[in-house]
Swiss-Prot record:
It comes from Ehrlichia chaffeensis (strain ATCC CRL-10679 / Arkansas). It comes from the Bacteria. This is tRNA pseudouridine synthase A. GO terms for biological process: tRNA pseudouridine synthesis. The keyword tRNA processing applies.
Length: 245
C-alpha cells in the first residue's frame, strides 16, 4: 500500500531532507525511523522537493510503501508520536495507487521566501526570516521580477556544484507581497535548479539595495555565470509551501 503524506517542519536544526552517511539528523532518516518504529517495516520515503539545511516546509509532500493496509489517521498519529521531540509533523495521510510518485508526479512546486526589513533584531521570526536592516526599494524589486519570470537559461542562478544537466527552467509565477516590514516573495515552477530560488531572492535584494537596476537582470541571464548574480539568500527564510499534482 502506498501512502502519500503532507509534512510540516522547522528546518533550523536539521542537515536538510536527504540522508547523509555521516549524520543521522536528516529529516528523511528521522521520518523513516519513525515509520519503522510503528510499522516494524523498513521503507524509503520519497519527497517532492529535497530541501537544504535550515529550509522549512509548510506543505512538503512525500510517499512511502508498506505491506499493510492501515487507516490513514492511524498512520498519521503513529508517525507523529514517534517523531517527538523533532520539529516535524505529519499534517495528513492519503492512500494512493502505485503510479503516484511524490517527486515525478509533481506538476508545480511553490516556495515562499520571507524577508523582514527593519533595523531591530528578530525575536519571534529568528531563524524563520532573513533580516535586512537598510530600507529596500520595493518598486525596483517588483520591476526586476518581470525579467525573471518565464523560460530562461538560469545558469547564473544556480549553485556552482549544481548537477542538473539542463539549466533551462520556466518560472511560472513570481510575485512580491509587501506589508510594512514584511516582504514575502512567492515563486512557482515545475522544478528548480539547486539554490535557484535563494539566488533569485539574493539578486532581487541587490535590486532593492539599488546595487542592480531592474534591467540588469537581462545582463545577468545573458552572462550565464554565477558570479554575475546576487548572493545566495540564507536558507532560514525559505519555505516549501505546497505541490500541485
Amino acid at each position: 500500500m502506498r501512502y502519500k503524506i503532507t509534512i510540516e517542519y522547522n528546518g533550523s536544526n536539521f542537515i536538510g531532507w536527504q540522508k547523509q552517511k555521516h549524520s543521522s539528523n536528516s529529516i528523511q532518516e528521522i521520518l523513516e525511523n519513525a515509520i519503522l518504529k510503528f510499522s516494524q517495516q523498513h521503507t524509503t520515503v520519497y519527497v517532492a522537493g529535497r530541501t537544504d539545511a535550515g529550509v522549512h516546509a509548510l506543505g512538503q509532500v512525500a510517499h512511502f510503501d508498506l505491506t499493510t493496509n492501515l487507516d490513514t489517521y492511524v498512520v498519521r498519529n503513529a508517525i507523529n508520536y514517534h517523531l517527538i521531540p523533532h520539529a516535524i509533523a505529519i499534517l495528513s495521510v492519503e492512500k494512493t495507487d502505485d503510479k503516484f510518485h511524490a517527486r515525478f508526479s509533481a506538476k508545480k512546486r511553490h516556495y515562499l521566501y520571507k524577508i523582514i526589513n527593519r533595523y531591530s533584531p528578530l525575536t519571534i521570526d529568528y531563524n524563520r526570516a532573513w533580516l535586512i536592516h537598510n530600507p529596500l526599494n520595493i518598486e525596483n524589486m517588483i520591476q526586476a521580477i518581470e525579467y525573471i519570470k518565464g523560460n530562461h537559461d538560469f545558469s547564473s542562478f544556480r549553485a556552482r556544484h549544481c548537477q542538473s544537466k539542463n539549466p533551462i527552467k520556466t518560472i511560472d509565477d513570481l510575485k512580491i507581497i509587501h506589508n510594512n516590514q514584511s516582504i514575502n516573495i512567492h515563486i512557482s515552477a515545475i522544478s528548480f535548479l539547486h539554490h535557484q530560488v535563494r539566488i533569485i531572492v539574493g539578486t532581487l535584494v541587490e535590486c532593492g539595495k539599488n546595487n542592480f537596476s531592474p534591467e540588469h537582470i537581462k545582463n545577468i541571464l545573458k552572462a550565464k555565470n554565477r558570479s554575475y548574480a546576487g548572493m545566495t539568500a540564507p536558507p532560514y527564510g525559505l519555505y516549501f509551501v505546497k505541490v500541485d499534482y
